[in-house]
């Protein structure tokens, strides 16, 4: 006993559930890499042999491979659901966040069953928007279940939020659009015009600086 106080910091545990690694790579990598500096982050995803797709994700992030199918498959979906419930019970996450319809449905049910305190889903589009008849009604019902079982709902645009409200899927008081709307924001450094290149092109084309193009 050295007499020194030993402090063990237990980070809050967060799980992010997506159907494919492409979603995490393209839309969520920046958020995940930021979150992992403050929280214990786990990605639950169907890798399907594409582990390299997550090479832009911090190695501090835990990755669990789960066979979630994008399309409806009763037996595969039930298996994924029970596996999710088991994972949630075992890890005792404080928050789970799902993106994409299938991941959203299975995660919301599993997290509700496992009594995860905070359950968040992000709507990025509706597979039923162009459907008609019973198929449209059924798929819309699944989105309503997602809304009912989650404690928080994010929508990636105001137009989509208005559409979902109009269709009776959710209400404005239980859904949030961050900022001006976007699933992952815009990298302003990447899309910032280059003044050097601008001046070079204007010089090559003999265009004066005060000319509006």
Regions found by a protein language model. Name each.
Residues 45, 98, 154-158:
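Short beta-strand scaffold positions
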Residues 64-65, 144-198, 207:
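Donor nucleotide-sugar binding/catalytic pocket of nucleotide-sugar-dependent glycosyltransferases
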Residues 16-76, 163, 168, 174-176:
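N-terminal strand-loop element at the rim of the active site
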Residues 98-104:
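Short His-centered aromatic/hydrophobic patch
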Residues 13-18, 111-127, 143, 154, ...:
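Active-site proximal beta-strand in glycosyltransferases
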Residues 4-12, 56, 192-213:
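Nucleotide-sugar donor-binding and catalytic loop/hinge architecture
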Residues 87-94, 207-208:
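Glycine-rich phosphate-binding loop signature in dinucleotide/nucleotide-binding domains
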Residues 26-27, 75-82, 117-118, 127-149:
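Nucleotide-sugar donor phosphate/pyrophosphate-binding loop at the beta->alpha transition
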């Amino acid at each position: 006993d050295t007499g020194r106080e030993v402090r063990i910091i237990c980070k809050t545990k967060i799980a992010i559930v997506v159907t494919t690694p492409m979603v995490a790579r393209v839309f969520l990598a920046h958020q995940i890499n930021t979150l992992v500096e403050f929280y214990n982050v786990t990605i639950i995803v169907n890798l399907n042999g594409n582990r390299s797709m997550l090479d832009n994700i911090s190695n501090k992030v835990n990755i669990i491979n789960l066979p979630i199918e994008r399309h409806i498959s009763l037996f595969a979906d039930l298996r994924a659901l029970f596996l999710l419930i088991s994972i949630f019970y075992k890890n005792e996450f404080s928050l789970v966040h799902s993106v994409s319809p299938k991941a959203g449905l299975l995660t919301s049910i599993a997290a509700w069953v496992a009594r995860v305190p905070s359950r968040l889903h992000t709507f990025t589009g509706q597979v039923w928007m162009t459907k008609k008849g019973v198929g449209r009604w059924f798929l819309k019902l699944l989105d309503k279940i997602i809304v009912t079982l989650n404690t928080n709902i994010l929508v990636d645009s105001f137009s989509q939020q208005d559409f979902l409200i109009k269709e009776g899927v959710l209400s404005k008081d239980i859904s949030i659009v961050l900022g001006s709307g976007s699933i992952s924001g815009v990298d302003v450094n990447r899309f910032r015009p280059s003044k050097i290149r601008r001046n070079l092109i204007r010089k090559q084309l003999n265009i004066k600086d005060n000319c509006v193009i």
